[in-house]
A protein has these predicted regions:
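Domain-level signature for soluble enzymes in the chorismate/prephenate branch of the shikimate pathway
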Residues: 1-99
Length: 99
């Protein structure tokens, strides 16, 4: 059995990798927002989001699947909010109610 410090180091490495992947995902979300702003495409696409969650979580053990779905939904929501803020920044005239 491995010692706790060794396991903790592995967790730290995984957390660092997750951080880098999250930053990459948000960078891609920003790219998506810019493209959608130019084409007047909608940010929120519930069917697409549901499809992503379903495909990515398929085949997982049930308890872990529930936790992963929660994590994935949170990440998708953060990406969507980031896209909205970018579109607001790019095209404030589309949001006349925004101060």
């Amino acid at each position: 059995m491995r010692e706790l410090p060794e396991i903790s180091q592995d967790i730290n490495r995984v957390d660092s990798a997750i951080r880098e992947l999250f930053l990459l995902r948000m960078s891609l979300a920003l790219e998506v927002a810019k493209t959608k702003a130019q084409s007047d495409d909608k940010i929120y696409k519930p069917d697409r989001e549901a499809e992503i969650v379903e495909k990515r979580s398929a085949g997982m053990e049930e308890e872990l699947q529930l936790k992963y779905v929660s994590l994935l939904q949170s990440m998708i929501r953060a990406s969507r909010e980031y896209q909205y803020s970018e579109i607001l920044r790019q095209t404030p005239e589309k949001f006349p109610f925004y101060p």
